[in-house]
């Protein structure tokens, strides 16, 4: 359970931000999530956030469907009101009220234009998950701002974060294969992301390729093998959807992203593949602050 881990982290730390990156109403009731994150915030005041998303692989593997945009919007509204200490009508005998309410910001992780606009209408912050190509980042931020204007909100009030799949390795051949699998994973669920940069999928139908990849190109057990399935993808396409390579290379790529001119409040370097808990280390969570961030500060 993420909230057990977050509670331990809250007690043992004093500065880092804490929170689930992508919760989904398909897996937990929004009122339960509001209560859980408020409890964590009581242990780490002002250091928490609650991240929402439609859910994809996680809910599909549970036999459920991703959350619809309208459902996510309603869950976001309910959660924010509960965290603000308001009474909320929930079709029960009495309105619901969170008696230990805390002012925890609610973020939404989004890829598609409808979800991005919805996040702009109702979230405190938006985690944009579209890779690192400037055209995709720009289009995504424009969609968030459009949603904010639809709700008579100031776009500047909405914080922007980036989720960037990050392949930290000195083995550049391995990095090249995994980065291709990452690009295919974006095309698998969000093919519209190939349009702003002017990319073309020039290989077999993705549905045919998926028959040999489980559960998908982002979460395959062997990301090098899944990358070989899409070796036809160009370097430009592979480079557009992840940070990859040595600490020096990743620092340079991240510096480029932060130099596009957009105001970015937070970057989440999402490790790919997921680190093995039995690894002797140093692992991703140690290498990024010790090896990547110092290089970034030098640029």
Q: What residues fall within each predicted segment?
A:
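N-terminal beta1-alpha1-beta2 module of alpha/beta enzyme domains
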Residues: 1-21, 104
């Amino acid at each position: 359970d993420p909230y057990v881990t977050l509670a331990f982290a809250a007690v043992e730390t004093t500065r880092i931000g804490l929170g689930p990156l992508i919760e989904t109403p398909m897996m937990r009731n929004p009122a339960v999530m509001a209560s859980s994150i408020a409890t964590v915030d009581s242990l780490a005041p002002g250091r928490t956030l609650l991240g929402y998303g439609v859910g994809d692989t996680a809910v599909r593997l549970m036999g459920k469907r991703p959350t619809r945009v309208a459902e996510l919007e309603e869950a976001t509204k309910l959660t924010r009101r509960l965290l603000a200490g308001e009474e909320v009508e929930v079709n029960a005998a009495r309105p619901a009220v969170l008696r230990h309410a805390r002012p925890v910001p609610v973020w939404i992780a989004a890829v598609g234009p409808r979800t991005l606009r919805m996040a702009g209408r109702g979230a405190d912050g938006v985690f944009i998950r579209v890779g690192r190509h400037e055209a995709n980042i720009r289009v995504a931020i424009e969609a968030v701002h459009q949603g904010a204007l639809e709700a008579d909100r100031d776009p500047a009030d909405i914080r922007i974060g980036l989720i960037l799949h990050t392949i930290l390795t000195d083995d550049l051949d391995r990095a090249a294969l995994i980065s291709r699998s990452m690009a295919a994973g974006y095309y698998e669920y969000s093919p519209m992301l190939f349009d702003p940069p002017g990319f073309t999928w020039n290989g077999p139908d993705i549905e045919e390729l998926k028959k040999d990849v489980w559960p998908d190109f982002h979460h395959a057990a062997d990301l090098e093998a899944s990358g070989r399935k899409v070796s036809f993808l160009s370097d430009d396409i592979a480079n557009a959807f992840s940070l990859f390579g040595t600490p020096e290379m990743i620092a340079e790529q991240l510096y480029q992203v932060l130099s596009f001119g957009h105001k970015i409040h937070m970057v989440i370097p999402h490790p790919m593949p997921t680190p093995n808990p039995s690894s002797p280390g140093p692992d991703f969570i140690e290498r990024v602050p010790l090896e990547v961030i110092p290089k970034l500060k030098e640029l």
